[in-house]
């Protein structure tokens, strides 16, 4: 009896062992097959054609977004009219820009840091993270952020001021993209950032001299890259001329972007908070200004605010002023005569007709632009 029990136990163990060996063998073959599949070279073509789709429920349309689409990038030194520019474009029914992402310039700066460090580049290459791999990843990442941080639209634009420090790189990633470089009198930009306490990485808000030096360096970098990609891809937009003659400049600008004219771009203030209109952030410093129609109230606020020693050295501190067409010794320069409609807008603004809507009333946090 005991002997028979031992035989049965031995037989059961043998069956279990056989089944286990068979299962492990099948599993090993499957793993080997998967490893072989993974070892096959990846078709780079598939990684280069990342497509995102967006559904516009109101218009019942689906849009396909990809690296070859005509993206629009708006940039410049902060306090140069980039928010006004994007608000005017956002008022166009076919264009969506939206608020600053803050992510895009940071990831671009990180990529620049990797490229500049020869040691880091060697490490990345050794790890198989080549320029081609990084570029493909950057394309997908940037497109994902631009597409998904707002509503779908036929044309998408991004407004992160310092993103244009990587203008030539963006032009390579998105070959059909176009760039709008906002240019403003550096004295006005610097006075605005100091008086409104807009913290910008590397700018000492206690020193007009330091801020003007940093302004000069930043705008020179972006201007040179704009010139490098050429006038067919990058357009300089002077803030002063945009607010003095908005219709003339918006018609020129939309023609450059190859987007049909729409009169709503001249009345962005009427589209704020509306579906498909202008979405504003409660914490961006320019929000309280772009709720107003285009006006010339901010053109010469800097006059009388800059220390005399800085004014005296202006041409040396900020040589880009002259290069961009501003007289470094005129206080203020003669920017030009505004259109009649702009004179009326400015009168209404001074009367206090335009106040911040309740849904945008929140004390802004200290904003740092990088």
UniProtKB/Swiss-Prot annotation:
GO process terms (BP): 3'-phosphoadenosine 5'-phosphosulfate metabolic process; post-translational protein modification
Predominant localisation class: Golgi
Membrane topology qualifier: Single-pass type II membrane protein
Disulfide bonds: 97-157, 226-234
Stretches that traverse the bilayer: 9-25
This protein's record includes keyword Glycoprotein: yes
Site (Transition state stabilizer) location in chain: 159, 286
UniProtKB keywords: Disulfide bond, Glycoprotein, Golgi apparatus, Membrane, Signal-anchor, Transferase, Transmembrane, Transmembrane helix
PTM entry text: N-glycosylated.
Spans within the Lumenal topological domain: 26-370
GO CC annotations on file: Golgi apparatus; Golgi lumen; Golgi membrane; membrane; trans-Golgi network
Tissue specificity of this protein: Ubiquitous. Detected in heart, brain, placenta, lung, liver, skeletal muscle, kidney and pancreas.
Glycan-modified residues: 60, 262
Residue positions of the active site: 100
List of residues binding 3'-phosphoadenylyl sulfate: 79-83, 184, 192, 196, 239, 286-295, 301
Places the protein is found: Golgi apparatus membrane
Cytoplasmic-side segments: 1-8
EC number of this enzyme: 2.8.2.20
Example GO molecular function: protein homodimerization activity
Subunit structure: Homodimer. Can also form heterodimers with TPST2.
Family: Belongs to the protein sulfotransferase family.
Protein function: Catalyzes the O-sulfation of tyrosine residues within acidic motifs of polypeptides, using 3'-phosphoadenylyl sulfate (PAPS) as cosubstrate.
Protein name (record): Protein-tyrosine sulfotransferase 1
